[in-house]
Amino acid sequence: MRLVAIVACLMVMTADAAAEQRYALVISGASGGQKYAEQMAEWRNGIRAALVDRYGFSPDDVRIFVDETVKTGGEQGTAQNVRAAIATLSKRLTKDDVLFIVLLGHGTYDGEAAKFNLVGPDLTAADWGTLLNGLPARLVMVNTTAASFPFLEPLSGPNRIVITATDSAAQKYATVFPDYFVKAMNEASTDLDKNGRTSIFEVFAAASLAVKQHYEKRGQLLTERALFDDNGDRVGREADATGPDGALARTLYLDAELPAAADNPELAALIQRRRELEAEAEAMKAKKASMPGPLWEAEYEKLMLELARVSREIKAKS
């Protein structure tokens, strides 16, 4: 009962607004026709609206890359423009920042290399791995295309959340995942634990469930299973699967923490400590089935008490 009370208290105390800077690249490539161009425009607009209006991203830090049919409202989704944007960000990003990248459109796999189809020359999964290598920020990479699965392994790494719309390189048909991912970003019900914030995992889980329901309602075989990896082991898992993933994705939120921490090193250190404790708590949850009940509860309660103490300090200093 005591542990329940501690957790309930923490849910209130950690529902504060991030000291980090948050950046987003929303990238559309070649449209493949007017139907897809209109669909991608809807997704881009939905993501931008969610990031800026719902989660408080600065409009200047959300860069939109459009397909070849669009003449205004964004930069062309070319390899050159994408490379330039990432090069610019690499000079600004710090280890505390968040970079959120979403790929919208089409992908291909020829048996050797998976590609995201851009306007002009494409970028392979290996190209993306090279582009993002060495970035200090926490990275969220969401590839919503059919040929997204082969992107998971080369992009996996520490402080990275990689999401793919499919679990097989053989998937060739257009995915419904991006539609439900965008909807999940915009819906209050996505906050599954009701702590007032929306984590990457919550968006992923909500979108994954909606995809399954999409196929079930139509009496169709489920042909796409979204995966995520957030522990750098290069192994993707579905949202409802057990395993070591989840600690980072459950504690990396789309909305911001405390802006005041930017000018307060002590507060920033406390927020960093809270992140670490939250990640430890998620890791402890994964160990519950493999530990004796009393031992697990004792260790988890100790962790929750420390998290409560740090959260109280953050609240007092903010």
Where are these regions (language model features)?
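Boundary/activation segment at the start of structured domains
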Residues: 16-100, 114-115, 247-256, 315-318
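Active-site-proximal beta-strand/loop segments in catalytic clefts of secreted hydrolases
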Residues: 27-31, 65-69, 102-106, 119-121, ...
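Second-shell loop/turn segments in exported
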Residues: 30-38, 67-76, 113-119, 165-171, ...
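Active-site-proximal C-terminal subdomain of hydrolase catalytic domains
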Residues: 45, 140-230
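A short, glycine/acidic-enriched catalytic loop
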Residues: 77, 103-135
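Alpha-helical, heptad-rich or low-complexity scaffold/stalk segments
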Residues: 144, 263-264, 270-271, 278-316
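Caspase-like cysteine protease fold
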Residues: 191-278
